[in-house]
Amino acid sequence: MKKSILIAALGLFSLSTMAQDAKPEEGFVFTTVKENPITSIKNQNRSSTCWSFSTLGFVESELLRLGKGEYDLAEMFVVHKTMQDRGANYVRYHGDSSFSPGGSFYDVMYCIKNYGIVPQEVMPGIMYGDTLPVHNELDAVASGYINAIAKGKLSKLTPVWKKGLCSIYDTYLGKCPESFTYKGKEYTPKTFAESLGINPDDYISLTSFTHHPFYTQMNIEIQDNWRNGLSYNLPLMEFMSVIDNAVNNGYTVAWGSDVSETGFTRDGIAVMPDADRGAELTGSDMARWTGLTAADKRKELTSRPLPEITVTQEMRQTAFDNWET
């Protein structure tokens, strides 16, 4: 069975770019080396559901690659189903696990395999008058409810507490449909998923850490991997080579990373700037550089091509071990 890459797991990374020579004021200029078909970028807005948006974007690109046509799949169907399972897990551990709106790519593939999927038009996932997701209130309400159940020192739970949690997500996201009509055909979420021809078991997760043996599967120890999904552990250079090979052969890759890193921007740029050399090369004297806010430093370091850190296996591991990424 051929396997496709699903995710490259959380950690430090460097993104090599084919940048043309440009004056500093011109910012980044890229040469397209390889372009694989994708669907339009969707806006998660004020929701911590990047994992659902990005993975379904990957699935949509796979459908294009397989000649299935263009689809817009419902992110909030996945969020709804995932948070029901996560709530049940949280209560089973008496609150000594993670219940948060974050997630992993494995959650999406698990949902497709076990619950199916629906088109976006069938479940837009916004029941409160906005056009884009705003989950501040939803997250607060769901957290308060589930903690009252999991940590409420109740002698016995009622048989309906799961319905209460489900009703919260029904209220904000809409109910997950049991059946629906799409382009003149009747489906359930499961039969619609089957019609797409995407088999979640055909996709694998890759990562690269030294605290587990290479060439074995490992559970990445982060809170959002609460389902304990496994990833194949490869040496860093092999890990990157596999990704390059996939892209060059027409596959897209879903990459899980840390948006708190200095080199992450919301402009489609991700770099690993060398802060010390960057300050020197942008002409900033020490007084000015030290006077910049963290946000200003970040903007300056990611606004134009600058020297980048070459990330090693050891650097990646140290950052992970120290909660830096």
Language model features: what each stretch is:
Residues 21-325:
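Catalytic-core signature of thiol
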